[in-house]
Each structure stands twice: as C-alpha cells, then as structure tokens.
C-alpha cells in the first residue's frame, strides 16, 4: 500500500509541478505529499472499501433470499394430526398435539432425557402413547435442537411398542424460540407458556412451513451469514419481498391461514386479516370464496 501511495504521489508531483523552481519546488512537493498521504489516499481507500463491502453485502443478501425461499417453499404435509416435540434436557420435552387445521388440542411436558431415571422414562412413554391413542396422532415432529437425538431414540422405542402406524420427522426449529417469546405468539396462545408455544410451532411447521415461518422475522430464521453485519434496512426489504413473493405464488388456505400469512396476500389489508383471525380455527370450513370475511372479487383474487 505504501509503495502504491509513493508511486501515485510521484505522478501527482509531475502533474502539478510543471516548472522547476528551486525556491518553491520543495514546498510544493511537501504540500502535495502531505495532501495525498493524509487526505486523498485514505479517502480513496475508504471509497473502494465501501464499494467492495456493498458488493459483498448484496451477494450475501442474495444468498439469504435464496435460502429463505427454499425454506418457505418446502412442501407441506397436509391432513395429519401432528405431535410437536420440543426437546430439552433439564426443563423437559414440551409436547403439543395439533389437528389437521393446526388447532392445538393438548399440551404437556415429559422428562425422558437426562437427567432422568427409568421411572420418568416410563411415565414419559405412557404420556406420549396416551396422546397418540386419544387424538389419533399420525406424525411426530421433533425439533432439531438440544436433546434432539436423545428424544429421537425414545420416540423410536415408543413407536415399536404401539400398534398405531405413526411416523416421525426431524424438523428445523430455527426461530421457534424467537416466535414463542414474541407478541404475536402471546396473542395467539395467551394461556400457553413459551415452551408450549414452541412445541405447537414445531408441529405446525410440517403441516404448512410457509404459514408458520411467516410469523417469524426472516432475519431470525438462520438461513444465511451473520445478519447483523449487513445493512438491516436493505436486508429486511429484500427478505420481506421474498416472503411476499412466496406467499402470493403459493396462495393460502383460509381454513388454516393466520393473520400474519394473510397480510402478505395482495389486496388483503391488516384489518381484513385480523377479522379473519377472530374466527376460531375450528369454525373455518370455508368451501366457497363468498364465505370469506370481506370477500369481494378483488379482495380474494390472490387468496
């Protein structure tokens, strides 16, 4: 860098000192060197660095957007009664059963992972078996966080001991803890604690990944590089656009859609989305477009 600056400074002297004057030449040379080394060169360096940083930032945001789109566009597993399993050690594994429309039917906590004993493991197995039998669970969705593998071992043992045909899947739980502590989750599940909300979210993610993930700030889903190193406004706008494109490309099911999902549909305002949310999930068998709240031709053409 110093060699480059010295070479540039020599070029500058030749450009500005056109006539040799032994009295003024040393002063002009010193002035040019000082101006270039102290002001001009650092300014150029900062500008180049900023341009490179901005270019790298744009590339990182594109990676964020591409990864987010792939996550949102995962195919849903519809028509399943799902047992959401939020694994943990000391605080226990939180369970939530949701029906085919995403309505939470039951929640509980079991302690099959360390520190534990045979008595607690047996009690946990009995609880899970009872939930499967009582609600007709057809799929278990296990979060991939802490104690995921230990929970998987217990689930495999349970499935071998019951006559029901139940499958299980490991689900990416990134952002579930952020959602469970959010204002939206508190409004949706006012009587549930953070763990129960997280288990319900893990269950719903396999039923309709897009509908569940739109409730979480895209920057918190963990689909790219360290997001705090980037321009937050630019990143937020880009990821918001990806979510909007995905929602409008796929459309929504009014029977299971939340207000958060409906807000991304073209022509649906937050007011209309909240009106829809007031209708309980169990009372939403919309089979005709005209039954939807505020359903005009223009209003629901993207739904």
Which positions does each model-derived feature cover?
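Phosphate- and other anionic-substrate recognition elements at nucleic-acid/protein interfaces
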Residues: 60-72, 78-81, 90-240
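Short hinge/gating elements
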Residues: 10-18, 46-55, 135-142, 184-192, ...
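Accessory alpha-helical DNA-binding modules that contact the DNA backbone or grooves
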Residues: 249-303
